[in-house]
């Protein structure tokens, strides 16, 4: 059933506002009073990336009075395929600055509050406290759990979305009326178990599909209309073009919103998720690939050094652990393709003639160094001694050795 509106009654709309929002005002569920609530509402968007982009545009168009944006990242060229608020001219700028400009282009009457810092346990409660609804567009597990716990402690709902490849999920987590994120996902996946969009890819337009649903849910919560996705998990398969709603329930044993909560203050979420401390980002940038931050734990060779070694009479064997789609974008000439999965199941050491000799020097590479570091660790455990990971992966090779190839 509908819940009480979260946005307070606002001041009367002037003539220009009525003209701008007339199609909202014509809706009986919104009307003049509802639009007045929206112009007074405050919504925080965590992450100005794939999901945050359409969300920010439609929140602005809807006339949300104040929109907060949390993101510590800068715009990169690879963002432009799906993060539609950013343009070519914005590459290198703070995402919060680019986002604020995009919101202003859509609706100059909206106030934008920028937080160009990583959302963490030290600042989350202070930032979230002033907003009616939190829209979670983050791309990493530590921040998802952080946003959830902060919202539970503050008694606020948060509208959550997630995308990967062709699949999306949306729900409204609100402990006062249903489950929180931890009720349904009590434990984070092991580090590296879930590939990032940077590793596995994502259909750009999927961001619009999921982000738009998040905005619709946000508006419903602000106005107290319709049936919000509290207690339901909406699952979208863009390839099959299906939307399924799954019932999810509150967990009485939930450590943060259950009958006897053990989490009564924010914790170290990087540690909770078993990942190294994040380095910037929407709320802490998601590593480009699993294990990226652990590259320093294995022997590493630089791209320029590798290029020099390849020009000698005794060049090392270069192994590429990426998949064929990634190799089609950028590659090191002569690299032997042996997928990381073959290192994980041991077949790399038994089924590939190239690795039959354990005396030849081997350099393993991937995109930026995370997957290759894992492969090197597995090879060392299997008895290989003269093996190293290419620091920075093929992207370092492109930057430092062969800039004719594209970055991705």
Where are each of the predicted segments found?
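N-terminal charged helix/coil linker that caps or initiates catalytic domains
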Residues: 1-44, 78, 266-288
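E1/E1-like adenylate-forming module used to activate ubiquitin-like modifiers
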Residues: 2-5, 107-121, 125-213, 223, ...
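Glycine-rich phosphate-binding loop and adjoining beta1-alpha1-beta2 segment
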Residues: 4-12, 66-107
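Conserved S-adenosyl-L-methionine
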Residues: 61-66, 383-385
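Hydrophobic/small residue at the entry helix of a nucleotide-binding pocket
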Residues: 51-52, 371
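Rhodanese-like catalytic fold shared by cysteine-dependent sulfurtransferases
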Residues: 3-6, 80, 101, 240-252, ...
């Amino acid at each position: 059933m509908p819940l009480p509106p979260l946005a307070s009654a606002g001041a009367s709309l002037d003539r220009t506002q009525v003209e701008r929002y007339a199609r909202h005002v014509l809706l009986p569920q919104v009307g003049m009073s509802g639009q007045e609530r929206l112009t007074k509402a405050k919504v925080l968007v965590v992450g100005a990336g794939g999901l945050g982009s359409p969300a920010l545009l439609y929140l602005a168009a809807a006339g949300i009075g104040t929109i907060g944006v949390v993101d510590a990242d800068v715009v990169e060229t690879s963002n432009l395929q799906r993060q539609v608020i950013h343009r070519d001219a914005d590459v290198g700028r703070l995402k919060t600055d680019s986002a604020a400009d995009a919101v202003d282009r859509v609706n100059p009457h909206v106030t934008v509050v920028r937080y160009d810092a990583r959302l963490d346990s030290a600042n989350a409660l202070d930032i979230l406290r002033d907003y009616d609804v939190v829209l979670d567009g983050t791309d990493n597990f530590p921040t998802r759990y952080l946003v959830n716990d902060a919202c539970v402690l503050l008694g606020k709902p948060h509208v959550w979305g997630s995308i990967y490849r062709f699949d999306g999920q949306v729900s409204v987590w609100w402990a006062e009326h249903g489950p929180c994120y931890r009720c349904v996902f009590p434990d984070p996946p092991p580090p590296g178990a879930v590939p990032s969009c940077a590793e596995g890819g994502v259909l750009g337009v999927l961001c619009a599909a999921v982000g738009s649903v998040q905005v619709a849910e946000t508006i419903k919560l602000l106005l107290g209309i319709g049936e919000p996705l509290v207690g339901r998990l909406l699952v979208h398969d863009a390839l099959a073009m299906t939307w399924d709603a799954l019932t999810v329930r509150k967990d009485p044993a939930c450590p943060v919103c259950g009958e006897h909560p053990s989490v009564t203050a924010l914790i170290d979420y990087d540690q909770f998720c078993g990942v190294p401390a994040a380095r910037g980002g929407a709320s802490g940038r998601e590593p480009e690939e699993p294990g990226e931050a652990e590259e320093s734990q294995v022997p590493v060779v630089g791209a320029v050094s590798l290029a020099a070694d390849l020009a000698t009479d005794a060049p090392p064997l270069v192994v590429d652990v990426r998949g064929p789609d990634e190799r089609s974008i950028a590659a090191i000439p002569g690299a032997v393709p042996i997928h990381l999965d073959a290192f994980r199941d041991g077949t790399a050491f038994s089924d590939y003639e190239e690795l039959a000799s354990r005396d030849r020097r081997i350099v393993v590479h991937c995109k930026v160094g995370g997957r290759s570091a894992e492969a090197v660790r597995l090879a060392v455990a299997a008895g290989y001694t003269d093996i190293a990971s290419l620091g920075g992966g093929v992207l370092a090779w492109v930057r430092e050795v062969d800039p004719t190839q594209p970055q991705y």
